[in-house]
Amino acid sequence: VVNLVESREAASQAVAELEAAVRIVGGKFRGRVLVTPSTNAIRPTTDRTRESLFNILAHNFLDKVEGARVLDLFAGTGALGLEALSRGARYATFVEESVEGRGLLRQNIEAFSLQGHTKILRRDACQLGIVGTMEPFDLVFADPPYGRRMGEKAFLSALQGGWLNPDALLVLEEDAEAALELDERFVVLEERNYGGTIIRLIQLKAAG
């Protein structure tokens, strides 16, 4: 009887872990599970929010995903950049300052055999510096710690450092209650609320 109870408890735990797993939700890697942190220090974008976001991109901004060079800021597990690669993006650069995050990124990239299509940078996303020899990026994700206006700082840093193509699409995930303080050179194209989270799609204002 004890063994049966233990087996049921183990099965229930396995089901709970499977339901809590973070997966790629579309494209060629659909259904693949990502390695995620054992603590709350890194907060991956939920599957539901990510699916909703990429549905918007697929319907309204498909040209910004397919063949894109992607910059994933505050990358954590890399869920957003890897989702973009799964859906046809050409290359993704992940910016992650923490040791844990970079370890998770390496594991996920290797699991998907994407070493030739990715780069991991150890640096502060709010102080990117000059892009250097890298090509500018077409699609930029920022999922920073909530409520600290770090996404806006990171976008400004990317602009000042030459990381953005003039028509790049920027995606910011933030707490729905957080105030937005964008540099005047950016404009919000669209925003969607998902519970306590808000997703904003942003571009540079047209010159002139």
Regions inferred by a protein language model and the residue ranges of each:
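Class I S-adenosyl-L-methionine-dependent methyltransferase catalytic core
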Residues: 1-208
